[in-house]
Amino acid sequence: SEEIELGKYVQGFVEDHIEHYKSRGLELSERITVKNATIIANPQLLQRVLQNILNNSAKYKMADIGHSVIDVTEDESHVYCVVSDDGPGVPPESLDRLMRPFYRVDSSRTNPQEGSGLGLSIIRRIMGIFEGRVVIDNIRPHGLRIILEFPKKGENHE
């Protein structure tokens, strides 16, 4: 793991991946409102987390073109990377189960060729390595928001 300035990292990630996701019908953008929000993480694992989330957004989009936005924000003690899409969201009773390995919301949402489950248990495991956490909720009128919460690397948290 190393120090990563999350805003810059996400900007670079979006630049590197925007065409790939566009080809899969997902418009990707970022909104970064922080400067120098530094976390300790492994860049390859962090990339895997973001790809995992966006692959789901591309897979479950409701229209020909879906949209995902990655926001980077912070408060006194944490830095947040928030990925929101405009897909179908998840039934409320399934939200707490999403983190289980291989859990699928329902068979109609998934195509057998598309791999096993949402892969969110991998995200939770990786965020555990980063001493962070994952919060998932639905957005109105529809969509899913995945909040990646990282402890802030700073003078107060050494």
Per-segment meaning from a language model:
Residues E2-I18:
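A conserved beta-strand-to-alpha-helix junction within the catalytic ATP-binding
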Residues V90-F102:
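Short conserved segment of the HATPase_c
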Residues D85:
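Acidic ATP/Mg2+-coordinating residue in the GHKL
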Residues S57-K61:
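Short helix-loop "hinge" at the ATP-lid/N-box region of the Bergerat-fold HATPase_c
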Residues L98, E114, G119, I123:
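Short alpha-helical Gxxx[C/S/T] motif in the catalytic ATP-binding
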Residues T38-A41:
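Conserved micro-motifs of the catalytic ATP-binding
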Residues E131-G132:
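Conserved glycine-rich
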